[in-house]
């Protein structure tokens, strides 16, 4: 039987899933490639049927990438998630990198459900790097939900402060990011890293008001992440700030990228001489 004959059987069948369920029918099809099989499945089965298909024993024995490609053809993100949440599901024998595309294909709400299921994460052998990567791809609101559960992060996932801070840095909405700084207990070392990712104006306000009780070298790092022109204006506007807080211009400039250091050197005469 050819691939064309198999297609004809599927066209005329009222129970297309049963055709794929019949191991002998598929085995009798000569030269049926993996690509042909995936195409037939995508053309003739709906999402829920594809879900059932991946639980058939002969389909669970297919090469890992073929199983992933079948799952990727399921349009409903919740159904794709269901495959991942199923104990001893069709991907339990695979390494994370083999079904990473499937993880990435989930929408944010489904990724959050998976991240909040520590048993499934363990069953899928998802390491901390994979968990961090998935968390970074969440929407800002879902990141907040995920990161706000401190006990779960610490006791179940055992995420390090470094990983948590990297996820917070990936938040796009500055207000959400600052709210997380108030909610998530972090060492100032990591808070400083996060503060370097916010807007110049907000950095200026935080440093001026010492909102997070930063030490001079930590404040210098945040100031050193400002744009050169903005920093020069900040220096000229708050001439007493540096001497009062034990911060030197040099300690800030060393945090500038090399290109910014050169730019600053060319503009140093724009700085109030009393501060220089």
PLM regions and their residue ranges:
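Ankyrin repeat (ANK) tandem alpha-helical domains that serve as protein-protein interaction scaffolds
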Residues: 1-276
């Amino acid at each position: 039987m050819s691939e064309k004959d198999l297609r004809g059987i599927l066209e005329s069948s009222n129970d297309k899933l049963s055709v794929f369920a019949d191991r002998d029918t598929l085995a009798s099809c000569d030269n049926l490639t993996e690509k042909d099989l995936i195409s037939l499945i995508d053309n003739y089965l709906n999402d829920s049927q594809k879900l059932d298909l991946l639980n058939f024993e002969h389909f669970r024995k297919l090469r890992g990438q073929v199983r992933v490609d079948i799952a990727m053809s399921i349009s409903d993100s919740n159904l794709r998630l269901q495959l991942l949440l199923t104990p001893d599901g069709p991907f339990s024998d695979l390494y994370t990198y083999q079904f990473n595309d499937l993880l990435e294909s989930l929408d944010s709400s489904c990724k959050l459900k998976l991240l909040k299921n520590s048993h499934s994460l363990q069953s899928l052998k998802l390491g901390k790097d994979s968990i961090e990567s998935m968390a970074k791809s969440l929407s800002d609101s879902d990141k907040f939900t995920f990161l706000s559960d401190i006990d779960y992060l610490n006791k179940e996932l055992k995420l390090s402060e470094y990983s948590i801070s990297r996820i917070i840095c990936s938040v796009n909405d500055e207000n959400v990011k600052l709210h997380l700084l108030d909610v998530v207990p972090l060492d100032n070392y990591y808070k400083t890293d996060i503060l370097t990712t916010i807007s110049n104006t907000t950095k200026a306000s935080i440093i001026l008001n010492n909102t997070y009780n930063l030490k001079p070298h930590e404040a210098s790092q945040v100031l050193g992440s400002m744009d050169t022109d903005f920093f020069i204006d900040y220096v000229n506007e708050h001439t007493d700030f540096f001497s009062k807080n034990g911060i030197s211009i040099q300690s800030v400039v060393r945090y500038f990228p090399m290109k910014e250091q050169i730019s600053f050197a060319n503009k140093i005469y724009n700085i109030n001489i009393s501060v220089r």
